Amino acid sequence: MSNNIKIKNTDLVLSNIGFGTVNAGLAWDNEDAFEILERYINLGGNVIDCARIYSDWVEPEIGRAERVIGDWIKHRGKRYDLVIMTKGGHPKMDTMNISRMSKEDMEYD
């Protein structure tokens, strides 16, 4: 990957293609996820996109994708080589009509 993106006023340099992880722990088991993520890193990627809500629709897998990503990061021991992006504020699966945009919700996510 080329054309990395430098974030002004920081030391962050992002690969121009991020890697979405909604399937981590679902379509990919841990072994597959680790292999896929390593391939992405070996190709020059460093931006991992995740969210607390990923996999919540498969009980009891609350937060499964984030746990798989966390296990992989711990396994490889190079957390600061990566830029982790996440999202918050998504409604809970059983209460989709209730907003989760409070400060507390953002901190929780």
What do these predicted regions represent?
Residues M1-V83:
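N-terminal binding-site loop/beta-alpha segment at the start of enzyme catalytic domains
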